[in-house]
Amino acid sequence: MGAIVLLEKSQRVLNSLAVSPVKVSEYILSKVISLGVISSIVAMFIAITLNLDNIIISTIGTFFSSIIFSLLGLILASKASSLNQFIVLSIPIEIICFIPPILNVLLDTKSYANLYPFNICISLISGDKNFIMINILISIIIIIYFITYYFICSSWKKVGGVKL
């Protein structure tokens, strides 16, 4: 996501979008849905080749994971001015996002650890059907969406070196 947004910044695409009738929500949804669909299609092919039982649940888990990481990538890309800066900014996010699920998979963790959003994604990708966890994950996605919306709005207001 960082490379996509930073390429748009370098080509001044965001300058055009800031003055166009495109809404911030449409911009965010276009990025998130396009990458989510691509990752879901790939996940579905992988699940089919591995003969997984719950292909649909696994694909939904992949789609939700893609949405969360795309939204986090948009937040970081809105603050980064170069690819190196984006990579440095993404390191703490990656640690926060990946360490608990790795520990959850490798160790026998308590049930409260299953409320962590990325642990929920891992359990969905594994094929577990838990609709309460899906609702929790959707709620977290909505919260992250509004945070992303705030960051993208503030970055669009600063486009072109002038605060609008």
Which positions does each model-derived feature cover?
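Hydrophobic alpha-helical transmembrane segments of multi-pass membrane transport/permease proteins
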Residues: M1, L89-P101, L137-T148
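Transmembrane helix boundary and interhelical loop/hinge segments in multi-pass membrane proteins
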Residues: M1-S20
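Short amphipathic alpha-helical coupling elements at transmembrane boundaries
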Residues: N15-V19, S81, S123-S126
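Alpha-helical transmembrane segments and their short interhelical loops
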Residues: V24-S25, V32-S81
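Residue-level recognition of transmembrane alpha-helices
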Residues: K31-V32, T62-F63, S90-I91, I138
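Structural signal for membrane-spanning alpha-helices in multi-pass inner-membrane proteins
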Residues: V42, I46-L50, G73, F98-V105, ...
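Transmembrane helix segments
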Residues: A80-N119
